[in-house]
Swiss-Prot record:
Higher taxonomy: Eukaryota, Fungi, Dikarya, Ascomycota, Saccharomycotina
Species in which this protein is naturally found: Saccharomyces cerevisiae (strain ATCC 204508 / S288c)
Keywords of the record: Activator, Chromosome, Nucleus, Telomere, Transcription, Transcription regulation, tRNA processing
Other comments on record: Present with 2180 molecules/cell in log phase SD medium.
Disordered: region residues: 1-63
Gene Ontology annotations for the cellular component aspect, listed alphabetically: chromatin; chromosome, telomeric region; EKC/KEOPS complex; nucleus
Designated name of the protein: EKC/KEOPS complex subunit GON7
Length: 123
């Protein structure tokens, strides 16, 4: 069976390929790490009513069906993509915060250079 793959590309030139790894347990389950309710919600007493069903097996139960394998592999790929994109969002957030901090510092320096004492609230 050919493995599914996913490609990511962004306007900033970042490219990433995702593919399941054969025999890796992350790609052999329908219970993803990044899907479903958060631990916070579950600890608050909520019940996961949307929990995915187990992957389908052959009649003798010895192996997963083709669609069962595909479901597990796609669940693992979805986790990989979600984790990657979460990391990208964190980087963007940190970069934005660093830019705002740099701008604030530069404005304070300019104000001091223009003769301000940086104590605008003092009477």
């Amino acid at each position: 069976m050919k493995l599914p793959v996913a490609q990511y590309s962004a306007p900033d030139g970042v490219e990433k390929s995702f593919a399941p790894i054969r025999d890796d347990p992350r790609y052999m389950t329908t219970e993803g790490r990044t899907t479903g309710p958060s631990d916070h919600v579950l600890n608050a007493g909520q019940i996961d009513r949307d929990k995915p069903s187990e992957p389908e097996r052959t009649k003798d139960g010895s192996q997963l069906t083709y669609l069962g394998q595909l479901r597990t592999q796609l669940t693992g790929l979805q986790d990989d993509i979600n984790e990657f994109l979460t990391g990208r969002m964190e980087l963007a957030k940190n970069k934005k915060k660093a830019g705002a901090d740099e701008k604030r510092i530069q404005e304070e320096i300019n104000q001091l250079l223009d003769g301000g004492d940086g104590d605008e609230d003092a009477v």
